Curated annotation (Swiss-Prot):
<keyword id="KW-0217">Developmental protein</keyword>
<dbReference type="InterPro" id="IPR009057">
    <property type="entry name" value="Homeodomain-like_sf"/>
</dbReference>
<dbReference type="InterPro" id="IPR017884">
    <property type="entry name" value="SANT_dom"/>
</dbReference>
<dbReference type="GO" id="GO:0009908">
    <property type="term" value="P:flower development"/>
</dbReference>
<protein>
    <recommendedName>
        <fullName>Transcription factor RADIALIS</fullName>
    </recommendedName>
</protein>
<keyword id="KW-0539">Nucleus</keyword>
<dbReference type="GO" id="GO:0005634">
    <property type="term" value="C:nucleus"/>
</dbReference>
<dbReference type="GO" id="GO:0048262">
    <property type="term" value="P:determination of dorsal/ventral asymmetry"/>
</dbReference>
<dbReference type="InterPro" id="IPR044636">
    <property type="entry name" value="RADIALIS-like"/>
</dbReference>
<dbReference type="InterPro" id="IPR001005">
    <property type="entry name" value="SANT/Myb"/>
</dbReference>
<keyword id="KW-0804">Transcription</keyword>
<keyword id="KW-0805">Transcription regulation</keyword>
<feature type="domain" description="SANT">
    <location>
        <begin position="6"/>
        <end position="61"/>
    </location>
</feature>
<comment type="function">
    <text>Involved in the dorsovental asymmetry of flowers. Promotes dorsal identity.</text>
</comment>
<dbReference type="Pfam" id="PF00249">
    <property type="entry name" value="Myb_DNA-binding"/>
</dbReference>
<dbReference type="GO" id="GO:0003700">
    <property type="term" value="F:DNA-binding transcription factor activity"/>
</dbReference>
Length: 93
């Protein structure tokens, strides 16, 4: 999924993956961190990767604060009573 929040052109999935990998290599104590990350994400400037990181951190804080609801996923494990009800209502012709 491409990200468009912030400014500039959207980030592609390939760019986001390169960005994630670069962050794993160049931690906060790395000299010239954003220049190194930008080199790993072809076509992005140090300013762009730093802004992308700041947006990511902001999003994580927002999620962790509970302001973003968890999606309501259907369970795949199955519930015996629910499954039995489904099978009872199933008519094979």
């Amino acid at each position: 999924m491409a990200s468009t929040r912030g400014s500039g052109r959207p980030w592609s999935a390939k760019e986001n993956k390169a960005f994630e990998r670069a962050l794993a290599v160049y931690d906060k104590d790395t000299p010239d961190r954003w220049a190194n990350v930008a080199r790993a994400v072809e076509g992005r400037t140090p300013e762009e990767v730093k802004k992308h990181y700041e947006i990511l951190v902001e999003d994580i804080k927002y999620i962790e604060s509970g302001k973003v609801p968890f999606p309501n996923y259907r369970t795949t494990g199955g519930n015996m009573k629910t499954d039995e009800k489904r099978f009872r209502n199933l008519k094979i012709r």
